[in-house]
Amino acid sequence: METVLNHPLFMPVLVTLVIIAAFPLVAGYIVLVERKVLADFQVRLGPMRCGPHGLLQPIADALKLLLKEDIIPTDSDKAIFWFAPCISTITGLVAFAVIPFARKIYVADVNVGLLVISATSAVGILGIILGGWSSNSHYSLLGALRSAAQLVSYEVALAFALLSGVMVAGTLSMQGIVQSQADRGVWGIFANYGFMVVPFVLYIIAATAETNRAPFDLPEAESELVAGFHTEYSGFRWALYFLAEYANIFVISSVAVTLFWGGWLRPFSSVAWLEKPLNYGVPVILFVGSGLLTFTLIRKVVDPMQQKVLLGVVVLLVLIGAIMAIPMVNDAMIGLFWFLVKVSVIIYTMIWFRGTFPRYRYDQLMNIGWKIAIPVGMASVMVNAVLGMLGKH
C-alpha cells in the first residue's frame, strides 16, 4: 500500500478521478448558487421545493435532463450533431489537468501550462460552431457565427492580459506563476506598483465575453435567437453544453486566481504572524459558523425529512471545521481551501454581472472588443514592460 501511495502517478490519477467524478455535481451546485443569487437580486427566494431551501434541486435537474427525450432534427448532420457537445465538454475538462489546486494537488505541471489552457479554450469553440452548423437551423447557425466572431474579438485582448501576467511571473508554468508570487511575497495583481490591476480587469471582461456569459451572451440571446447555438439540442446533449459552460467558468476563474491572486497562497503570505490566524482561524470559523447558521434554519422547516437533511448538513459543516483544525490535515488542505475561496469570489462576480448589466447590442460588443479592449491590452503590455525594466534597475 505504501508503494502505491508513494508512486509518482498516484496523486495525478487520484486528482483526475476526483475531477471527473465531482465536476457534474459541482457544476450543478454552481447553478443552484447562481439561481439563488439572482433570486436575491430580484427579491425572490429561488428554488425551494426540492429538499430544504432547494438543496436537492441540482440532483432533480440532472435526473430530468437524463430522462428527457433526445431529439435529433431530421435534416441535421447527425454524426457532427452528436459529437459537437463532446468537443466542448472534453476541452473544458482537459484544461483542469494543468490547474494547480494546491502545492501538491494537480494532475500535471506543464512548463507551458498557461498556453495549454489558452489552446483548449480556443479548440472548445469548435464544439459550438459545429453544433450550430450541424443543427440545420438558422437560429443555431447565427448563434454559432456570433460565438466565433466573439472569440476572435476577445481572444486577442485576453492574450494581452495573460501576457502581462507572464511578463511579471517570468514563466508559463502554472506552478511557476504561483511560486513567483510566493517568492515576491505579493500577489500578481499588486505587482509593478499596482498597475497589474489593469490587465486583471481586462482579463475578467475578455474572459466573460469568451465564455458567452452575460452581458456578452449574444450567441444564445433568447430574445433574438431562441436559444442560439443549442436551440435544437435537448436532454443529455444539451447537458453536455451546460457542463462545458460551467467548466469554462471554473477554468477562467482558476486562471485569474493563479495569475493575479496568488493561487493557493493565503492572503498576506509574507506576513509570518498571520499564518495561524488565517490558516486555522478562517476555515474553522467559516465552516463551524456556517453550520451554526444552518442549524437556526431547521426549526423553520416543517417537513421532518427536510429537517434531517439540514441536520446532516450542519453535522458535515461542523465536522469539516473540526478536521481543518488538525495540523496534519490543515497543512495538506489549506492551499485547496484558499484556492476554492478565491475562485468562488470570481464566480460570484460573474453571476453579479449577469444580474446587473443588460445585454449589449452586437455592434457594441464588437466596438468594446476592437476599439477598447485590444488597445488597452497592448498599452498594458508596454507599460508593464517598462515598469519591469525599471524595477530591475
From Swiss-Prot:
<dbReference type="Pfam" id="PF00146">
    <property type="entry name" value="NADHdh"/>
</dbReference>
<feature type="transmembrane region" description="Helical">
    <location>
        <begin position="158"/>
        <end position="178"/>
    </location>
</feature>
<comment type="similarity">
    <text>Belongs to the complex I subunit 1 family.</text>
</comment>
<feature type="transmembrane region" description="Helical">
    <location>
        <begin position="186"/>
        <end position="206"/>
    </location>
</feature>
<comment type="subunit">
    <text>NDH-1 is composed of 14 different subunits. Subunits NuoA, H, J, K, L, M, N constitute the membrane sector of the complex.</text>
</comment>
<keyword id="KW-1003">Cell membrane</keyword>
<dbReference type="InterPro" id="IPR001694">
    <property type="entry name" value="NADH_UbQ_OxRdtase_su1/FPO"/>
</dbReference>
<keyword id="KW-0830">Ubiquinone</keyword>
<feature type="transmembrane region" description="Helical">
    <location>
        <begin position="79"/>
        <end position="99"/>
    </location>
</feature>
<dbReference type="GO" id="GO:0048038">
    <property type="term" value="F:quinone binding"/>
</dbReference>
<feature type="transmembrane region" description="Helical">
    <location>
        <begin position="333"/>
        <end position="353"/>
    </location>
</feature>
<dbReference type="InterPro" id="IPR018086">
    <property type="entry name" value="NADH_UbQ_OxRdtase_su1_CS"/>
</dbReference>
<keyword id="KW-0874">Quinone</keyword>
<dbReference type="GO" id="GO:0009060">
    <property type="term" value="P:aerobic respiration"/>
</dbReference>
<keyword id="KW-0812">Transmembrane</keyword>
<feature type="transmembrane region" description="Helical">
    <location>
        <begin position="13"/>
        <end position="33"/>
    </location>
</feature>
<keyword id="KW-0997">Cell inner membrane</keyword>
<dbReference type="GO" id="GO:0016655">
    <property type="term" value="F:oxidoreductase activity, acting on NAD(P)H, quinone or similar compound as acceptor"/>
</dbReference>
<feature type="transmembrane region" description="Helical">
    <location>
        <begin position="240"/>
        <end position="260"/>
    </location>
</feature>
<keyword id="KW-1278">Translocase</keyword>
<comment type="function">
    <text>NDH-1 shuttles electrons from NADH, via FMN and iron-sulfur (Fe-S) centers, to quinones in the respiratory chain. The immediate electron acceptor for the enzyme in this species is believed to be ubiquinone. Couples the redox reaction to proton translocation (for every two electrons transferred, four hydrogen ions are translocated across the cytoplasmic membrane), and thus conserves the redox energy in a proton gradient. This subunit may bind ubiquinone.</text>
</comment>
<feature type="transmembrane region" description="Helical">
    <location>
        <begin position="368"/>
        <end position="388"/>
    </location>
</feature>
<feature type="transmembrane region" description="Helical">
    <location>
        <begin position="278"/>
        <end position="298"/>
    </location>
</feature>
<keyword id="KW-0520">NAD</keyword>
<feature type="transmembrane region" description="Helical">
    <location>
        <begin position="112"/>
        <end position="132"/>
    </location>
</feature>
<protein>
    <recommendedName>
        <fullName>NADH-quinone oxidoreductase subunit H 2</fullName>
        <ecNumber>7.1.1.-</ecNumber>
    </recommendedName>
</protein>
<keyword id="KW-0472">Membrane</keyword>
<dbReference type="GO" id="GO:0003954">
    <property type="term" value="F:NADH dehydrogenase activity"/>
</dbReference>
<feature type="transmembrane region" description="Helical">
    <location>
        <begin position="309"/>
        <end position="329"/>
    </location>
</feature>
<dbReference type="GO" id="GO:0005886">
    <property type="term" value="C:plasma membrane"/>
</dbReference>
<keyword id="KW-1133">Transmembrane helix</keyword>
